[in-house]
């Protein structure tokens, strides 16, 4: 399997921007945990079938797709239901991510996982790349992008791993504050580093 670089960062840190630069500039294959999480609950999948069996058919729309708003309501204030859902989906998502990583054809792969730290998924990665920004930058970007209040943005931030927790597991860091060095320059340096590691078959 290709060298796997786990890409993570807090909300509004710029993970998607960084991943897209790797893909567009250097043709690096990407496995995105958010996309995988949607795929494993598409109509007809064992994941969605189990959710329907547990919560009832009205957890889906008329076209048999998952009604995410309803599911959020069911688990929002019910820790037991949330735990049940996580116990169902986390192993399926993990298995699908491994499958997708095995299909990679580029020299190395980016595994984009917003909650890499929280869900202990760094075990799937050879290296961890953290997109790091100041909390104030995250707050202002979240308010602007997601049309939420500052209070809501702070609450989202508080629910995620701390900046320090992410940096503690980082092998590499991309700085993405407004005054930091050019993003593409940082990514080009990392790309060259990862290619050199692939050639030497180094994992750490």
From Swiss-Prot:
Q: Which reaction does it catalyse?
A: 3'-dephospho-CoA + ATP = ADP + CoA + H(+)
Indicate which residues the UniProt annotation says bind ATP: 12-17
UniProt GO MF annotations: ATP binding; dephospho-CoA kinase activity
Tell me where it resides. Answer: Cytoplasm
UniProt entry keywords in alphabetical sequence = ATP-binding, Coenzyme A biosynthesis, Cytoplasm, Kinase, Nucleotide-binding, Transferase
EC category: transferase
- Top-level lineage group: Bacteria
The family line of this record is:
Belongs to the CoaE family.
Question: What PANTHER family does the annotation carry?
Answer: BIFUNCTIONAL COENZYME A SYNTHASE-RELATED (PTHR10695:SF46), DEPHOSPHO-COA KINASE-RELATED (PTHR10695)
General function of this protein: Catalyzes the phosphorylation of the 3'-hydroxyl group of dephosphocoenzyme A to form coenzyme A.
Protein known as: Dephospho-CoA kinase
